[in-house]
A protein has these predicted regions:
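GTPase G-domain guanine-specificity segment
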Residues: 1-11
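P-loop NTP-binding site
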Residues: 11-139
Length: 139
């Protein structure tokens, strides 16, 4: 609601679509165990991991904290994973991917795809409408 109010204050009448970001692996994760490294807050990270079609054995919501990543990599559940699913962030590359390379663990990069929350308008339609308006203004 605060975000909608802020948008309305600078762009009255502009359509808004509340979304959540869903993890989207760059390639299939397969049948092995997966450790999921994400920037999502701890209270959301586990529910996002549940949406993955994979055997997620560990969730690490600390991608911006190199020390926390090192501590997580020392955990048995993380170290035992056959695949690391990793959002692309500097610390993830420097710490997690380096560890994976040294230990023969497969890395799959993860994107975050916006999905409208239930009851919200279609995001693609709203974006197309906004793009059409922008093009019309430049014509």
């Amino acid at each position: 609601d605060d975000t909608r109010e802020a948008i309305e204050s600078v762009a009255p009448g502009r359509a808004t679509v509340a979304v959540t970001l869903r993890p989207s692996p760059a390639e299939p994760l397969g049948d092995g165990s997966v450790a999921f490294f994400t920037t999502a807050p701890p209270e959301r990270a586990s529910s996002l991991a549940e949406r993955l079609e994979a055997d997620v054995v560990a969730v690490v919501p600390a991608l911006s904290d190199r020390q926390a990543l090192r501590e997580a990599l020392a955990r048995d559940d993380v170290a035992a994973a056959g695949t690391f699913l990793v959002e692309v962030k500097a610390a993830a590359i420097e710490v997690v991917c380096e560890y994976a390379a040294e230990h023969g663990i497969r890395v799959v990069f993860c994107d975050n795809v916006p999905e409208p929350i239930d009851g919200e308008p279609d995001l693609d339609a709203a974006l197309l409408e906004l793009a059409s308006e922008a093009v019309a203004l430049r014509a």
